[in-house]
Design a protein with these regions (language model features):
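Disulfide-stabilized extracellular recognition modules
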Residues: 64-122
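Second-shell loop/turn segments in exported
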Residues: 8-17, 55-74
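Bulky hydrophobic/aromatic "packing anchor" residues in well-ordered structure
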Residues: 7, 25, 58, 111-112
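Short, surface-exposed glycine/acidic/tryptophan-bearing loops
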Residues: 23-68
Length: 122
């Protein structure tokens, strides 16, 4: 994945796909939110079967013509220091992503799971 490529380039272990986080990220992307709702994100992750803490990234953009949606999302997150730090957080070991396209707009979520941290809404 593009996220794991960024992690490799920055000397941190790759993330393993986690189905509960994949499901949660897809549910969150389908909400068509343009900003984070931490409580909804954490509650959705728990409801999908991931009871631990998560780091989350969200990016919303017009569907690109010159690169894939995954490439554009990772580029956007890489250009924002907070989102970049979430991508390379060495405490995280699992990954879930979700993409919804609505009226030519891509809503992309990334959840990085940290089994050692607590979900504040669990």
């Amino acid at each position: 994945s593009h996220i794991n490529q960024v992690r490799r380039e920055n000397g941190v272990p790759e993330l393993e796909i986690n189905q509960a986080l994949m499901d949660a990220a897809q549910i969150c992307s389908a909400q068509l939110n343009r900003s984070h709702n931490s409580q909804f994100e954490c509650e959705t992750a728990a409801a999908c079967g991931y009871p631990h803490g998560i780091g989350s990234n969200l990016t919303v953009f017009t569907t690109p013509r010159d690169q894939t949606i995954a490439e554009k999302a990772v580029t956007n997150w890489g250009n924002s220091s907070g989102h970049f730090q979430t991508m390379i957080d060495a405490r995280c070991e699992t990954l879930g992503v979700g993409v919804t396209i609505h009226n030519g707009i891509a809503y992309c979520y990334m959840f990085a799971g940290d089994a050692e941290s607590h979900n504040p809404y669990e």
